[in-house]
Design a protein with these regions (language model features):
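N-terminal Rossmann-like FAD-binding beta1-loop-alpha1 element of flavoenzymes
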Residues: 1-29, 184-206
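Positively charged, amphipathic N-terminal segments that serve as targeting/anchoring signals
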Residues: 53-54, 73, 82, 86-94
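Gly/Ser/Thr-rich loops at beta-strand to alpha-helix junctions
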Residues: 9-12, 73, 131-132
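N-terminal FAD cofactor-binding segment of flavoenzymes
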Residues: 11-67, 75-76
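Fold-independent oxyanion-binding glycine-rich loops
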Residues: 8, 32-34, 128-130
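Short beta-strand to alpha-helix junction loop
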Residues: 64-84, 99
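Predominantly flavin-linked oxidoreductase catalytic cores and closely associated redox partners
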Residues: 87-205
Length: 206
């Protein structure tokens, strides 16, 4: 089966990795407009390393600073899943875009355009996750644990904090925003959604 994944989110990488780990033979292509996975200037919620079993499988892809604590930054998880997926055969096409010209038939632009013919057919297409809805959370990376907030030690002398109110402190290095119900569950929920889609697809093939 030829599978096309239309973004490089944590959810989509979890989908790809679940398909790959199923033992089924599939050709998976992932499209990204970025130059590399996890490349973002915005702060996104991290997670505990033991929050999902899939994270244990990418532990060896984590930077050394991550080994000292239990907290994993969002970008570390993102890159770790990508490295593991690529090592299992995922084809990621960076700086690329795609248009569907007919049902299941796509045209590729950018670097992916040189890898494919004029048009390519795929048996299954995994679409990007819908935009989050819910509460607006304010995030911050700071040089100290912030009072009256749940701050997570990032392992390098900085702390990550998410709050429903704006965070103001002299030691803040970076601000961020995230929309959803619970920042501490953001990574786990994305992984679960990807796994669920993959299991649904695999079940339909039996």
């Amino acid at each position: 089966m030829r599978i096309l994944v239309l973004d490089d989110s944590i959810r989509s990488l979890a989908f790809s990795l679940t398909i790959q780990n199923s033992g089924a033979t599939n050709e998976i292509h992932m499209i990204s407009e970025k130059t590399e996975v996890g490349l973002s200037d915005s702060l996104k919620p991290g997670t505990n390393r033991d929050s999902h079993t899939m994270l244990q499988g990418i532990d060896h892809h984590m930077p050394k600073v991550a080994m000292a604590g239990s907290f994993l930054r969002n970008s570390w998880v993102h890159r770790g899943l990508a490295i593991e997926s690529v090592s299992n055969g995922l084809n990621i096409h960076f700086r690329s875009a795609v248009n569907e010209v007919d049902r299941g038939i796509f045209e590729f632009h950018g670097t992916a355009g040189s890898s494919f013919g004029v048009s390519e057919h795929f048996d299954y297409v995994s679409h990007p996750p819908q935009a989050n809805v819910g509460i607006l959370w304010h995030g911050a990376v700071s040089t100290k644990s912030l009072a009256a907030e749940v701050s997570r030690d990032r392992g390098d002398g900085t702390f990550e904090t998410w709050s429903r109110t704006q965070i103001k402190d002299s030691g803040i290095l970076q601000h961020g925003r995230w929309v959803g119900e619970e920042p501490n569950e953001a990574v786990v929920m994305a992984i679960r959604e990807g796994v669920t889609e993959a299991i649904r697809l695999l079940s339909s093939l039996k």
